[in-house]
């Protein structure tokens, strides 16, 4: 089996390092259980696929995915958190006991449990246990995608919602393991998720007297996050905008189902909103560069 896995590597990489990888695997698997050997082989296969696709920490694509991964996790948590709080609001308003809705083995229950798993996994990942949290997030998103296809319009569009859920899972999985997000990035992603989620819950609970976001509020939050990150790092904002764009599939699904149910406007806005933040950050960068030139000219 390990021989077939090694074939996943690019030919040049396999020629240079294939024997070394094989030797390390045999040494590690010698005293390992069957589960341990399977896990080691799975890790090698994942690394081989990343190298084949150019998604390692040495490539720009890999670094982009690493920057986007915590925000993708936060976006998934915010979207699924809306499902969970919507269910809770229904339970509060219903005269039936809460446990009866959970004990009924139907598609709605599967959707709810998958959403709860995503939320718990995201909290786990963003509070320091990234690997275990990501496993829960990916499992929850996969379950959500499957249940949404079966349920129809219960939790969203039967095509767009599962497609965006699976795309988010792939984005999170593709993050290079040696570029796991640090505490600051995780804290920022958690704050972004909270700011995206809380007003939506307030609107559903009729705490706010109006609702005019048409599904776009979470995308606006991502754009603002990219702008803030660009301003803090004093960069043109292109990297931050790209990361926010990669992280936005869960919010695109929400905009599609919670807004107009029209794919073209939502996709256009999903691409334009993060880029608006990049343009604003780039304008700030140009102003700062102009000031620097003026100061240097004044010193001459």
Give residue spans per PLM region.
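Cytosolic juxtamembrane regions of integral membrane proteins
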Residues: 19-96
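Disordered, charged N-terminal biogenesis/targeting segments of membrane/secreted proteins
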Residues: 1-31
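Hydrophobic alpha-helical bundles in membrane proteins
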Residues: 62-300
């Amino acid at each position: 089996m390990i021989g077939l896995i090694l074939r996943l590597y690019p030919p040049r990489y396999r020629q240079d390092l294939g024997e070394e990888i094989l030797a390390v695997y045999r040494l590690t698997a010698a005293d390992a259980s069957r589960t341990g050997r399977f896990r080691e082989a799975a890790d090698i296969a994942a690394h081989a696929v990343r190298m084949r696709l150019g998604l390692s920490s040495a490539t720009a694509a890999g670094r982009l995915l690493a920057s986007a991964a915590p925000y993708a996790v936060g976006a998934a948590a915010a979207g699924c958190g809306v499902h969970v709080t919507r269910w809770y609001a229904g339970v509060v308003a219903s005269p039936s006991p809460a446990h009866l809705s959970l004990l009924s083995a139907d598609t709605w229950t599967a959707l709810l449990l998958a959403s709860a798993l995503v939320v718990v996994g995201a909290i786990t990942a963003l509070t320091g246990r990234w690997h275990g949290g990501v496993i829960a997030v990916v499992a929850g998103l996969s379950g959500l995608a499957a249940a949404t296809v079966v349920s129809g319009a219960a939790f969203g569009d039967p095509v767009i919602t599962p497609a965006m859920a699976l795309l988010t899972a792939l984005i999170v999985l593709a993050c290079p393991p040696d570029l796991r997000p640090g505490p600051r990035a995780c804290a920022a992603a958690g704050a972004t998720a909270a700011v995206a989620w809380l007003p939506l819950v307030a609107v559903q609970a009729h705490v706010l007297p109006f609702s005019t976001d048409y599904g776009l509020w979470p995308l606006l939050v991502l754009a603002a996050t990219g702008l803030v990150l660009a301003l803090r790092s004093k960069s043109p904002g292109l990297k931050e905008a790209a990361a926010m764009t990669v992280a936005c599939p869960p919010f695109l699904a929400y905009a599609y189902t919670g807004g107009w149910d029209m794919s073209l406007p939502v996709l256009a806005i999903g691409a334009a909103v993060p880029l608006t933040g990049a343009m604003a950050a780039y304008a700030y960068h140009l102003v700062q560069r102009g000031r620097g030139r003026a100061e240097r000219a004044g010193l001459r």
